[in-house]
UniProtKB/Swiss-Prot annotation:
This is Type III effector protein HopBF1. Effector protein that targets and inactivates the plant molecular chaperone HSP90 during infection. HopBF1 is recognized by HSP90 as a host client. As a result, HopBF1 phosphorylates HSP90, leading to the inactivation of the HSP90 ATPase activity and chaperone function. Phosphorylation of HSP90 prevents activation of immune receptors that trigger the hypersensitive response in plants. HopBF1 is sufficient to cause severe disease symptoms in plants infected with P.syringae. ATP binds at S39, Q40, K41, D106, I108, D113, Q156. GO terms for molecular function: ATP binding; kinase activity. Keywords: ATP-binding, Kinase, Nucleotide-binding, Secreted, Transferase, Virulence. Belongs to the HopBF1 family. Changing E74A: Significantly reduces kinase activity. The keyword Secreted applies. InterPro entries: T3SS_HopBF1-like (IPR054555).
Length: 201
């Protein structure tokens, strides 16, 4: 049965359309296999829906705001970007398990984290079709950032097994110069382009 939480209001920025901040927490009885960990979240396969994963925020990793507020804002920003046509790792609901708050999101099988790729901790496949998809999606994201004049705080991506690039874990979306965000996209695009140039030699 859903548990209702009174998450605090989310700060608004000029020009950003007002998307209702979700505040309802759904208690889940269990989580599946652990898929990985980031700087703030532990990620598990969902037992409620095999197409989803559960991203639980670890305590004391969100600074001065609560885990509830942090998760609600990330869910809100993800939905806002999706409404603007950006490719995102879709997020569906706020959840609670084992006294931790989190988000139910799409489970991207065999996903690569863009930060791992950009910092040479992992390598994307050299397959031509894969890298063409990465470049196409990067170009689309750059175009939309320019069109909407957006800066995405802590911009990062997951790349699926076909080279499709999706924005993941957006911390904030601000109406501002997009150049810093575009530079981040170009880092990933350059790696895919280099793979294509190497393949053409």
């Amino acid at each position: 049965m859903p548990i209702v939480s009174s998450a605090a209001s989310i700060q608004r920025h000029p020009g950003i359309q007002d998307v209702a901040a979700p505040t309802e927490l759904t208690s889940i009885p269990s989580v599946g296999e652990k898929l990985g960990s980031g700087s703030q979240k532990d990620v598990y396969h969902s037992r409620q829906d095999p197409r989803q994963c559960i991203c639980l925020i670890r305590p004391d990793t969100t600074g001065i705001i609560s885990g509830n507020e942090y998760a609600a804002k990330e869910l809100k920003m993800t939905k806002h970007l999706k409404d603007l046509g950006f490719p995102v790792v879709d997020a569906y609901a706020l959840v609670k398990y084992d006294n931790k708050v989190g988000i139910a999101k799409d489970y991207i099988h065999h996903a690569l984290d863009s930060e791992d790729v950009i910092h040479n901790r992992k390598h994307i496949p050299t397959d031509m079709a894969f890298n063409k998809n990465v470049m196409k999606d990067c170009d689309e994201i750059i175009s939309r950032l320019r069109t909407h004049s957006l800066h995405i705080e802590d911009l990062q991506f997951l790349i699926d097994g076909y080279g499709r690039v999706r924005i993941n874990d957006p911390r904030d979306v601000i109406r501002s110069s997009p150049e810093k965000s575009i530079a981040k996209v170009r880092e990933l695009r350059a790696i895919a382009l280099n793979n294509l140039l190497d393949d053409s030699d």
